[in-house]
């Protein structure tokens, strides 16, 4: 009996202890929502900016420094959206999550950036030198962001690589299904479905091919199916944050209330936007909920359009905590307006 007890004690004493939970910090809540899909129960995820907060202008707080000081992984866009991030990292002095450290993840890596300026001038407003940084508004980009987070997690927690990989692959599959429908992903396989989306060949492919005697187009579902009602149409936008959404769902921002990013619109420009919306009979004004709601509603009222005011980031409005819920709010909000106009 004593020998057995000693053997058990030795066995438990030499077993590898479970690694402590990872502390993941993200600049934006949307990156946090994606990170949670992968981290699962192996860690905690904390976001610095609030979901209904303009990510360009976040007021640094001492508590943010403390969060970053203890972080194992930090996810940020990596462009010039969150100019408040570098000073926080400097003050935190955590080499693990400082730029170049193993726990520093740039969400934009591998994403084809849109609206890269040909010249830089303050006369154009707060333009982004490397391109539009609102990368998460395209679900395909969300897959790339998830893959970047996975790479970072493997660096800081190699013992959890298999666990994180399984969860990331599951997230990808569910996101593809939400984008184009479960049936189509099942027929194509997730790998082919992703490739067709990433190369912008999906519509051409499903328009030319059949499965079991029926056009593949009939198997389309998800957000792309719901967005067919506004595909090829125009909307007005408040700020230049929907470029990737517009590109994926093929709905153009015909004009912007905020013509120059970061600079309040002049009364003359607002009147020009109203005139254009009336002339083209644009039915929707798409805007994030951290902009001036009164101005958004006034422009919409003067044009007969509907103001579709949404959270740009996860958790920025009730019912948008997950990335899936967030995209649902965008697509369903616009689809309701364009369905009404089509009836």
For each feature predicted by the language model, list its residue ranges.
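Extracytoplasmic metal-acquisition and chelation regions
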Residues: 16-343
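Bacterial N-terminal signal peptides
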Residues: 1-13
